[in-house]
């Protein structure tokens, strides 16, 4: 959506058969959208992936709330339960996989690195096993000896010869007989204990820093691919949406609402659906997408319920404008860049949020909600532009494209990995790591404070709250402390009058008023070292946070 839609994805042979071209990297990345849902990627039950895909794709790209139809026909819109599961059938053949971004040569090198590391680790583990095994056997024998004789007989019996009941007894006693390393260390001689600690320290070094030096992890990401075996299996309506309870007497064919023809699935189910969705004679996707773009620029969409174009979502405030923008979006080959330019160079976007008081009051009386945008709707910057603005003012923003995400709280991305180097913490806010995990909170406090969702469910529009954590971030966070210092260093290279003028222009995109300039110069004249406090003050002005 940031560039152009590729309209020609297949070649057509003379006999009329369609053959998919080799997938481009951006196509594989795009499919990763379906793997980013709130699903357990290690689970064998993939029903949650398909159901989540239906709900998210229909909401995000079609402006429909179809969740009701998972259990029954939609109560308001013409969407049947059968339509929901026909859409689910589109995604039924998809399975989650981890896609490695590496060339064949890189894969060979990685295999060599892993093999060399494994040999080094095995060499470090061997003396530990030799040292601990006699102690382990003695502790095990001592624990078995205090068990009842009939239990001892079961434990000493070969696992292959045990009956099912005997195996149950052995399993029940396993926690009692398990010998942990700390128990072994307790009974070691002092000499062996010192030797064991040294060996463990060496192994820990190998598993940590040494592994990171020897084995360079290949870049990879989660995506989906088509399982051809699943593609041949039938799909069914699910009782109450439960993947474990398919109604075998209610099979469904792949399809989607609002399409009465016969889909051509020779290229693929998802491909056929996406071709229909983005066809030039189908304005649905274009309306939904361009409304979201308008919402992002103006704080509210032309259709206020940007994810619900059904009966309960109401009607657009300006249908002709929405239709015209959708037609322009299609005519410009679905180029978001061109639509950004069209909107941002328009007269309505360049209006100010304040102006002649009498005229503002008159407009407010006619249009209290400012639906006709007589003036610009005052709105706070989102979290990511706030981050970018802070670093840009400090002269420390890295605008390079691509690369891994970073965590501003400098947590390791996974166990055993290294935190983000300080040099990589000045990237644009779009690269701040966010999301969810089954075992830890990933969304940084900064993003949470400024209303960024964790991504578990579609978020058609972020809330605009005003809370104490937001003010505290700008008052005393380490990020603002560092940015204020760098901003002050940037201004200190200029004479004070120029520094004051430059500070206002950089932070607020306007020159200071005469009163502001006089007050700033009076404050700084007594002590030029106050430039850091001056920079901090500019960060804490409402104008820095709000688009006016």
Which residue stretches match the model-derived regions?
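Residues that flank catalytic or metal-binding motifs in active/ligand-binding sites
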Residues: 13, 29-30, 83, 150, ...
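Hydrophobic stripe of amphipathic alpha-helices that form coiled-coil interfaces
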Residues: 94, 124-127, 131-134, 138, ...
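Sequence context surrounding c-type heme c attachment/ligation sites in exported
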Residues: 6, 19-122, 443, 447, ...
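A structural supersecondary motif
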Residues: 438-440, 448-458
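Primarily short, surface-exposed interaction patches in extracytoplasmic proteins
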Residues: 1-19, 45-50, 58, 77-78, ...
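Short His/Asp/Glu-rich catalytic/ion-coordination signatures at enzyme active sites or charged loops
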Residues: 37-45, 90-123, 143-195, 507
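Acidic helix/loop microenvironments that form the catalytic cleft of cell-wall polysaccharide enzymes
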Residues: 32, 85-93, 143, 148-149, ...
